[in-house]
Amino acid sequence: MAGHSKWAQIKRKKAANDLKRGKLISKHLRAIQAAARAGGSPYPEANVQLRNAIEAARADDVPMENIERLLQKLQGGGEGAEQYEEIVYEGYAPGGVALLVYALTDNRNRTASEVRHVFSKHGGSLGTTGSVAWQFERRGVVVCENTEAAQEAAIELGALDLEEEGENLTVYTEPTEAYRIAEALKAKGVRVEAVEVVQHPQNTVALPPEEAQKVMRLVEALEDLDDVQHVYTNLDPESLQVEA
């Protein structure tokens, strides 16, 4: 029976991993579809936002055949492709930490119900439109290799701020400039790891580590929802660091 139990555990773990992988692929495909719409073209060569969405999907090992199948549908007028709309939910986590939740959904009622349930289960509260959005500002973020040449190029191209994180350099830009700067960095031979437009907190909230963990459990539960693409928070990252 012990052997049977061991294999049952492995099977359950594999099933859980397969489910998580399936969700990741689905989220990337939705992001590709949204990028095609937002960037104005279903053709990657004419849409830098779409190209970057595809690159992000490939970095997470989304099968190229899945991507190509979706692109063919979009390039054929979208027939057969799911129609998603972006919805933003605003609310508070325990400790008064603000959350912005971005979802792509084909069913508003289902998504709202799931998001509300997660907030309630983890001690948060779902707010109304505008209740926390004012605490964030849109920023472009380009993550690239951290070299002196990359730093000089980023400044020359109009970066708002630079943040060194080991081998990576995070370049903050105006939201409308992120993709232009990323492409210009690539043209200068700089290796770009990621580019996106995010909601950046204007101020952060510091909490004791145990309270910060409650916030992160809420964030992770929201991110596990199929329809949720991004969760932004104004929790101070240092709140998650436990002193040795």
Curated annotation (Swiss-Prot):
In alphabetical order, the GO MF annotations are: DNA binding
Please provide the Gene Ontology terms (biological process) for this protein: regulation of DNA-templated transcription
Query: Which one Pfam family would you cite for this protein?
Result: Transcrip_reg
Keyword hit for RNA-binding: no
What coarse category fits the chief subcellular location reported for this protein?
cytoplasm
Keyword flag Cytoplasm: yes
Q: What subcellular compartments does it reside in?
A: Cytoplasm
Q: Name one GO cellular component term.
A: cytosol
Known InterPro entries for this protein? Integrase-like_N, TACO1_YebC-like_2nd/3rd_dom, TACO1_YebC_N, Transcrip_reg_TACO1-like, Transcrip_reg_TACO1-like_dom3, YebC-like
- Alphabetical keyword list: Cytoplasm, DNA-binding, Transcription, Transcription regulation
Q: So what family is this one in?
A: Belongs to the TACO1 family.
HAMAP family associated with the record: Transcrip_reg_TACO1
Q: Name the chain's protein.
A: Probable transcriptional regulatory protein TTHA0821
State the organism named in the record.
Thermus thermophilus (strain ATCC 27634 / DSM 579 / HB8)
